[in-house]
Amino acid sequence: MEQQEKKKRKVYRRRRLQSKPTSSFPLDLASEILLRLPVKSVVRFRCVSKLWSSIITDPYFIKTYETQSSTRQSLLFCFKQSDKLFVFSIPKHHYDSNSSSQAAIDRFQVKLPQEFSYPSPTESVHGLICFHVLATVIVWNPSMRQFLTLPKPRKSWKELTVFLGYDPIEGKHKVVCLPRNRTCDECQVLTLGSAQKSWRTVKTKHKHRSTNDTWGRCIKGVVYYIAYVYHTRVWCIMSFHVKSEKFDMIKLPLENIYRDVMINYEGRLACVDKLYTLNNDGIRLWILEDAEKHKWSSKQFLARYVHNDLRTNTISKLTGVTHAGEFVYISTQYLKSFVLFCDPKKNRFRKVEFNGIVDEEFRLSNGVGRGRIYALYNFPNHCESLMSL
């Protein structure tokens, strides 16, 4: 892997040296500056010259930018209104504080593809998000404001369960599709960015069915999701290795876990203990230590899975964890613009309010109305991507 990276860097540097600059501005310096800019500024610079465009669209530059972008993450929200998707991005440094605060946001709207009715999203994986509506899969790059509708994986599959994975070694995204509510021993896989946008059949020795409410989680090149295995008749975690396209089965630490939430806790997969949460005031996380040995460890926290604020009559649910280790709570009925962050070890909550998401001015100017917004999608730890769909 290290030799591959060195080779790519040499090719990238040779290409820049062979190019004839239109000014005396050093290209190495230009690249370093571009790598530090937000994606909307980088996209604008593609129009400066053919040379600058070739730098920005170079695969090695894109991968390097995405690697650096992973340290400049944001909290992304979006909701659908008519044929538009309203998008709100809150940079990490705006909410990365030890106290309650107010934060500014970056917002925009995009026109939706015709197939985009009432979609189910994946998590944000290395800058991309997948939506699926019945048997239609739509890939979205919020940074580039691009949508890509993929060909249907199978005519006989009327509804799908969709996962998005990323291979950090080769820098490739892959979409994984399974038939919804059907037991099978194969899936369809499509590699994004390849010349041929076609599906491949990948077999698995574990005949299984994914749950209706499962949310996949991609961690370090492996996609995890909850499934029911046919031959053992038990619920388990299925893992899909994005690079090798190999499936494995991981035993659950216990049956009573929340099937609609899996989180990335300190770079490892974690499940929430449902029984412990219902019987106690806190949260117990089961953290995957060794997938091959089916080994899990547990941690208890005072923070609750659902936070009920009686003063504001709002209920917020645990949706993820920031890279700083804070639990992220999002309101289930969005009327006011705020997010709760919790230090789980100290059980200390702080509220960050965001002006401009569903405030009066925004509602009036966009015809949203005064009611609660129920289908507000949120994506913690979203990073920017220059990948063109």
UniProtKB/Swiss-Prot annotation:
PROSITE patterns: FBOX
Entries under SMART domains matching the protein: FBOX
Domain of life of the organism encoding this protein: Eukaryota
Residue ranges annotated for the F-box domain, each copy included: 19-65
Sequence intervals crossing the membrane: none
Protein name: Putative F-box protein At1g47790
One Pfam family cited in the UniProt record for this chain: FBA_3
